């Protein structure tokens, strides 16, 4: 079970985090999974023998589950050891406002802190959900502001970050790119250009795909 993407939606996300736009385009089958895009975040050696690309959203509950169950081990076991080049690609599944704002915040934090921001937002989903309907994240603004401050951004810098037209355009392009790669839900992983099945949404799913490649 993953969070699905409606590829034909064209929406304007207003309200809790006003001024954030989201556009989604149609789907094609021209995968470009190993090419670094302007909206991507990456970790590890660029020339590592294995490239793992994850399409995810900070507002996707299943992504948050896998983030806790797999990613710390994955980073330590494969990325930090030089075996894997990891690319994270943002998708706008889940609450669109929070997804856009969260990913823009990660970009504004800089490459050294981007993954810290992604992790912090995913771990704060339940807190953002307090006081409102499920997955509406009515408490998102104070939580995201706090996370911004934890990586050295003021509230004013945070506000400018999540409403920056250039940043929003980058997010739109990243979203379009994911759809062109045939991604229809999150989380989705490609390993050396091949989409892998997810069954348990923990480290075993990644181990099962990566270990055979390391033995070649």
Region annotations inferred by a language model:
Residues 2-94, 98, 172, 214-216:
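Extracytoplasmic thiol/disulfide redox context detector
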Residues 2-9, 29-33, 57, 145-216:
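C-terminal cap of thioredoxin/glutaredoxin-like
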Residues 20, 82-83, 113, 166, ...:
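Residue-level recognition of short, well-ordered coil/turn positions
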Residues 39, 47, 92, 104, ...:
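A general structural-boundary detector
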Residues 47, 108, 161-164:
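Functionally engaged cysteine thiol sites
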Residues 58, 65-149:
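Structural alpha/beta surface segment adjacent to cysteine/selenocysteine redox centers
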């Amino acid at each position: 079970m993953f969070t699905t993407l409606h590829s034909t939606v064209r929406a304007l996300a207003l309200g809790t985090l006003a001024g954030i736009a989201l556009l989604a385009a149609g789907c094609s089958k021209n995968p470009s999974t190993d090419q670094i895009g302007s909206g991507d975040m990456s970790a590890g050696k660029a020339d590592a023998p294995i490239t793992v690309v994850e399409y995810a959203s900070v507002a996707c509950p299943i992504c948050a589950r896998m983030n806790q169950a797999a990613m710390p081990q994955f980073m330590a076991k494969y990325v930090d050891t030089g075996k894997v080049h990891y690319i994270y690609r943002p998708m706008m599944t889940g609450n669109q406002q929070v997804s856009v704002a969260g990913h823009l915040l990660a970009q504004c934090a800089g490459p050294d802190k981007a993954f810290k921001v992604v992790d912090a937002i995913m771990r704060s989903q339940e807190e953002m959900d307090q006081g409102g309907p499920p997955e509406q994240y009515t408490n998102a603004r104070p939580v995201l502001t706090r996370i911004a401050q934890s990586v050295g951004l003021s509230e004013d810098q945070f506000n400018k970050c999540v409403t920056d037209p250039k940043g929003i355009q980058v997010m739109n392009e990243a979203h379009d790119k994911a759809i062109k790669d045939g991604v229809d839900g999150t989380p989705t992983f490609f390993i050396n250009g091949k989409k892998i099945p997810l069954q348990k949404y923990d480290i075993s799913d990644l181990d099962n795909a990566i270990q055979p490649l390391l033995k070649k």
